[in-house]
Amino acid sequence: MPDHVIAKFVLLGELEALSPLMVGTGSGDVIDAVVQRGYKGNLPFIPATALAGVLRHNLASKPQTTVERYFWGDTGGSDSGSQSHLAVSDLLPVAGSVPRIVIRDGIRIDSTTGIVADKAKFNFEVVEPGATFAVRLEATVRGWDGKQKNAAEFESILCRIKSLCEAEGFSLGAMTTRGFGRLKLKNARLFRYDFPADGAAWFAFLSSGTPGEKNSRDFQPVQTSQSTFSIFAMFAIKSSLIIGSAPDTPDAPDKSHLQSNGAPVLSGTSLRGAVRSRAERIAATLGGAKGIELLKEVFGWVDPEEGKKTSRSTPLKSRISIDETIIKNVTPAVQSRIRIDRFTGGVAHGALFDSMPLWNSGDSEVSVKVRLSNFTPGEDDWIAGLLLQVLKDLWSGDLPVGGEKSIGRGVLMGKSAEVSWCDTTVSIDQNGDKTVIDAAGREELNRLAAAFGVKMGGC
C-alpha cells in the first residue's frame, strides 16, 4: 500500500518550570554537572529526546498496542519495527525570555557516621523556576494507519499527553525524585490538518508558524487513575534552620541559607536525605539487613562499586519523590561563632566564623510534599506505613533537617497534614499539645502502620 499522509496533528504550548530544572551534558571544566546550552549562544534548552522519552515512558502500554507502536515507534527487536509517527521539537525558551542559571552545591552524607563522606562534595548547574519553554509536537497519520479510526486514536494519545503534562507530578531531567524538574503545561492548543483538503493551510502554517483557527480542535477529557500515595504536611521551625549555600560575595557570611529566585527554600535533596536515613534506621531496627534490602526498591539503589558483579547490578529508580518548597515567615540573621581548643580551653586560632540561618519570626511555614509513585493498595501498604513513621518523627521534632543540627537547628514542629491515596484522604491537625485525627482516619493510618510492622516482622 503506498505511503501517503492522511492527516497531521500539532500540539502547541509552553512548559513552565515549577522547580529547579537540570537537563545536563556532563561535567564541565569547573562545574561537575552543567546544563544543556546552545540556543542563541548560551541559553539553556530542553532536548526533544528528553521530553519524548518521558512521554513514552509514562504513556506507552506494556506491551504496546498496534496503534501505540505506530505512534511511539517500535524496533520489535528486528528489522520489522516501525518509526515513530510523533515528531518532538527541541524546547527553546519562549521569545524574549532569558532563563536564569545558578550553581548549587551538594554533599553526600555517610548514613553510618552522619557526616559528609570523603570526597563527596560536588556542584551542579540548574535552571531557576519560572523558566518557560515552547512546546511543539507533531503527529503524522499515514496511509497504512487505518484512516479515520487511527486518526482518532492518535488524537486521544495527544489528549493524554496534555493531561500528563498538566498533572502535578510531571517532571523531567535529573534529580526528579529530589524535587527538580517539575514542569506544567500552559496554553495548550491542538490543531488537525486533513489531506489533501487542508494542504494549503498546512503550508501556510509552515511558512508563518501561526496555525489557522479553523483547524483548531478541542481537547477531549481524559480519565486518569490515581496511583500515588502522598503526604502534604505543614510545619513550623522551632528555633532556626539552615541548608548551607556558599557565599557569592566576599563580604557575605561564611554560610547562608539556600535560596531560589531570592526566596529561602527547603531543598528536596536535603529533606530526602533525612527521610531516607531515618527510614533505613527504622527498617534496620525492626527488620535487620533484610529490612534495608527491601528499601532499595523504594528509595532507589546504585552499585557503589562501578563494574562490580553483584546479584543486582541494574540500578533501581526511587519511587519516593520529595518537592522543593518555599519557606515563609522567617527572618535571616547572622550569628557569629568560635571554636574552642579542647586542650587549652581558649579560642582556636583562626576559628571565628559566621552563618546566617533562618529564624522563626512567629508564624513560620515549612511545607513538605512526599509522593510514592505506582502505589498499589494492599501490596504497598507497608511502604505507606513506613512513611507515616518518618512523618511522626518529623512532626514531633525527633528528625531535624539541614545543617548544624548538633547545635539545635533544623527541628520542625507539625501543624497540619493531609495523607492521600486512592479515594482516601486523612487530615491531621495539631491543636496545642493534642494531635487531632478523626476516628475513621486514625483507623486507616493504624492499618498502614500495622502493615509495615507485619512486613518487618516477616523479615
Predicted regions and their residues:
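Small/polar/charged residue-enriched interaction surfaces, especially the RNA/DNA-contacting tracks
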Residues: 1-459
